[in-house]
């Protein structure tokens, strides 16, 4: 087969659909366009059985603002799927991804902009946010008879030639999962940012690296929040995703350690590119502003490339930045965002500890 490397994945799939190899591997396929200004969910008419594999290939851009042309996102930011009724939502970790249906039902697709209410795909945020979105995503779907990896390998062996097919097979053969004990926060989606690593002293740490991505991993804890409660950690930032203040909705790219409290709110301690230590602000993103507050604990690039220790009085920081502190800490978060200015980041975090004099909890 001649090379289709310059063709769209939809064109390649259309060319393959009548081949014996394609019919042997694929039960159904579809190409569709999702307009950015259409809230979720959109039915595809494709039926899946629980346990069936499917792959999603997407391209395109959703523009968030005419006044700010640099504000936009692609499939990794916006495209989600679910099997309805009853299935959990999933998102693309790359511009291609593959999934296993957790329920039997219809495959649905959705453009995400705002805040999920739950992991079934109900939106908590206002649908009005969609009215200003422009652009669209082009989506191709393959429903497999067997495994996604087996189907992709068979198509490639039969002569199918497209970078997206090869990339997705490689993606499946080399999965990147979050560090043990940590999971991605549903509202921010799955990613491939964080991995278990070691410091130069052979101590366990979490390394985060990427470009034009975002992700939050969380670890469940149960720790009292008293005037004596402190959170300590060490971190090293080698590349920061922002070079300007992060407290605007156009430049909100940052690295942070955070604590979530029993009331659902969270306080994130950030290493800012340029805001002064002690500065705190509500998240400038509307869907997050009532939930999340940022507190600058370190600033500037002078200490990039070296391990730096932090220790924060959680109760006092909450009282200063949010208000009356709740009674308990329920999760610790690691956060990185680089989707506003589309920059790169490289950092590591180690030795996260909660302690209050009476007890000590080693989180990492």
List the model feature ranges, each with a label.
Residues 1-169, 177-178, 250-252, 273-284:
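Acidic, Ser/Thr/Pro
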Residues 109, 119-126, 249-257, 291-300, ...:
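Extracellular beta-strand ligand-recognition surfaces/modules
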